[in-house]
């Protein structure tokens, strides 16, 4: 479904190089130390960085040089990137039409996603009137309403308290299962990864150092467990 073959990004003339295959509907955690290249990997998949070499295909189609706006990918950041002067409904609607000219079917889709996110009673509010958790629900709704086959999460819930973070992770996982979306999530928390991802990828020094079952990583028996400070 998603295949990266020696995708290379030159960081201060030092190559970060990734090869990875993810199947449709998989939920994969991207783990590793700070500065290892986790966000770089996601930005290469999203098209925000242009690789120096290598290839990236989605469903067999080459998207190595496809601009972000045309890639079949949605990405959610820690900074929710909501427009402060637009209502919740308008912010979500941008995922369907940049000019906010929505037809009846699109309006219904927008409200259905809002109900799923539990924010249908907030549609007329501005982002500044919402809590941090509510703002991230709006940002997630904007991603999901686009119905792209791949969802990328770059630690969007790290600023939330543990209970709210777990609630959001469950919401993401359930939504991806319902829409049959492929999920890749960058996280510093192996516990968060274990909640929704049966498979994990460990990035270290600009390379994929290990990939396999998350439970093996947590047990301390994986070769990459030590990279994350996990001992058996």
UniProtKB/Swiss-Prot annotation:
Known catalytic reactions: thiamine(out) + ATP + H2O = thiamine(in) + ADP + phosphate + H(+)
GO cellular component entries: plasma membrane
Keyword Nucleotide-binding assigned: yes
Protein origin, superkingdom: Bacteria
The EC number(s) this enzyme carries: 7.6.2.15
Compartments where found: Cell inner membrane
GO molecular function annotation: ABC-type thiamine transporter activity; ATP binding; ATP hydrolysis activity
The entry's keywords: ATP-binding, Cell inner membrane, Cell membrane, Membrane, Nucleotide-binding, Translocase, Transport
Limits of the ABC transporter domain: 2-230
Keyword ATP-binding in record: yes
Annotated residues for binding of ATP: 32-39
Pfam families associated with the record: ABC_tran
Listed InterPro entries: AAA+_ATPase, ABC_SmlMolc_Importer, ABC_transporter-like_ATP-bd, ABC_transporter-like_CS, P-loop_NTPase, Thiamine_ABC_ThiQ
Membrane topology: Peripheral membrane protein
Annotated SUPFAM superfamilies: P-loop containing nucleoside triphosphate hydrolases
Task of the protein: Part of the ABC transporter complex ThiBPQ involved in thiamine import. Responsible for energy coupling to the transport system.
Sequence similarity: Belongs to the ABC transporter superfamily. Thiamine importer (TC 3.A.1.19.1) family.
Quaternary data: The complex is composed of two ATP-binding proteins (ThiQ), two transmembrane proteins (ThiP) and a solute-binding protein (ThiB).
Protein name as catalogued: Thiamine import ATP-binding protein ThiQ
Annotated organism of origin: Shigella boydii serotype 4 (strain Sb227)
């Amino acid at each position: 479904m998603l295949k990266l073959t020696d995708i290379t990004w030159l960081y201060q003339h030092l190559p970060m190089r990734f090869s990875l295959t993810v199947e449709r509907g998989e939920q994969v955690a991207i783990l590793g130390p700070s500065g290892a290249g986790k966000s770089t990997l996601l930005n290469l998949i999203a098209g925000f960085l242009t690789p120096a070499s290598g290839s990236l295909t989605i469903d067999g189609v080459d998207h190595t040089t496809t601009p972000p706006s045309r890639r079949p990918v949605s990405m959610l950041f820690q900074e929710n990137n909501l427009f402060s002067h637009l209502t919740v409904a308008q912010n979500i609607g941008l995922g369907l039409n940049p000019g906010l000219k929505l037809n009846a079917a699109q309006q219904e889709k927008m409200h259905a996603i809002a109900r799923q996110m539990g924010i249908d009673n907030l549609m007329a509010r501005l982002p500044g009137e919402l809590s941090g958790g509510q703002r991230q629900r709006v940002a997630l709704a904007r991603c999901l309403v686009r119905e792209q086959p791949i969802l990328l999460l770059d630690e969007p819930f790290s600023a939330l308290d543990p209970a709210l973070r777990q609630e959001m992770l469950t919401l993401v996982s359930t939504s991806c299962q319902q829409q049959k979306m492929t999920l890749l999530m960058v996280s510093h928390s192996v516990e968060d990864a274990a909640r929704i991802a049966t498979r994990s990828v460990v990035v270290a020094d600009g390379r994929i150092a290990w990939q396999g079952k998350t439970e093996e990583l947590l047990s301390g028996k994986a070769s990459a467990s030590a990279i994350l400070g996990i001992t058996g």
